[in-house]
Regions:
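C-terminal long alpha-helix characteristic of the crotonase
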Residues: 20, 123-128, 178-227, 240, ...
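Short helix- or helix-capping micro-motifs
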Residues: 61-63, 156-165
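Acidic, divalent-metal-coordinating active-site segment for phosphoryl/phosphodiester hydrolysis
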Residues: 165-171
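Hydrophobic, secondary-structure "cap" segments at the distal end of domains
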Residues: 146-155
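Glycine-rich beta-to-alpha active-site loop
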Residues: 90-137, 166
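Glycine- (often His-adjacent) and acidic-residue-rich active-site loop
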Residues: 54-92, 108, 220-221
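Conserved CoA-thioester-binding segment of acyl-CoA-metabolizing enzymes
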Residues: 1-55, 88-91
Length: 260
């Protein structure tokens, strides 16, 4: 059985982690499936938003224990290859040209926090707990660190990477790791509301804006960075979509890309 299910509703694709019996912990097979799913969906013109969801009581518990047991006997070269696959999954999710929403219905541990951090928007139920537990096992949250630190900030990361404390959904909201905390009954409606906003924005502007965010965030404001921002807006203004958006605004009509 596949470790994922992929469903579609209009222009929204939902990728659901489907290993509830192990709290959606990932192994090498699941890592490959997630990587392939986001790579393929990101290339589809009929998909404008991707929701990452999970079955069962937990969103993702990080690495599967059986997979970790097998890693105990790996050589350094094998560990490099294995960690490289995990890093590729995280980067594929982070760089997916389509906007992504993490629908967090339960606890998120270790590598699972990387999945959340690599998504553009994160919505969690108020009962969800979070934990970067790697140091308790003598390990490091290495491959997920670029994404988690960007999401929660370096100061919060110092605390939660080093102490491996469990923190609540409200704390995740306070430090900026998630954007919304809702009750279980409100989760789907909030995700649908955000997805609706994303699919009705300019379908070419959204991935361009996502790339802009990744290029600009955390960078020094240099002449080169300013030139990049000038070039990006100039390119968009003369594009077919940019012209349509501006004309629709000036003429007080809806743009032709809207989905009802």
């Amino acid at each position: 059985m596949s470790d994922l299910t992929v469903t579609f509703e209009g222009a929204v694709a939902t990728v659901t982690l489907n290993r509830p019996e192990v709290r959606n912990a990932f192994n090498d097979a699941m890592i490959l499936e997630v990587t392939q799913a986001f790579s393929q969906l990101g290339a589809r013109d009929d998909v404008r938003c991707i929701v990452l969801a999970a079955e069962g009581s937990a969103f993702c518990a990080g690495a599967d224990l059986n997979w970790m047991r097998s890693m105990a006997d790996y050589t350094h070269a094998q560990n490099l290859e294995d960690a490289g696959r995990l890093a590729t999954m995280m980067r594929t999710l982070y760089e997916c040209p389509k906007p992504t929403i993490a629908r967090i219905q339960g606890d998120v541990y270790a590598g699972g926090t990387g999945l959340v951090a690599a998504c553009d928007v994160a919505v969690a139920v108020d009962t969800a707990g979070f934990c970067l537990s790697e140091v308790k096992l003598g390990l490091l949250p290495s491959t997920i660190s670029p994404y988690v630190i960007r999401a929660m900030g370096a100061r919060a990361a110092h605390r939660y990477f080093l102490t491996a404390e469990r923190f609540s959904a409200l704390e995740a909201l306070r430090i900026g790791f998630v954007h919304e905390v809702v009750t279980a009954g409100e989760l789907d409606s909030k995700v649908a509301e955000l997805a609706h906003a994303l699919v009705n924005a300019g379908p070419k502007a959204v991935p361009a804006c996502k790339k802009l965010l990744q290029d600009v965030a955390g960078q020094d404001i240099t002449p080169e960075l300013v030139a990049l921002t000038v070039e990006s807006i100039a390119n968009v203004r003369v594009s077919t979509e940019g012209r349509e958006g501006l004309q629709s605004f000036l003429n007080k009509r809806k743009p032709n890309w809207l989905i009802n």
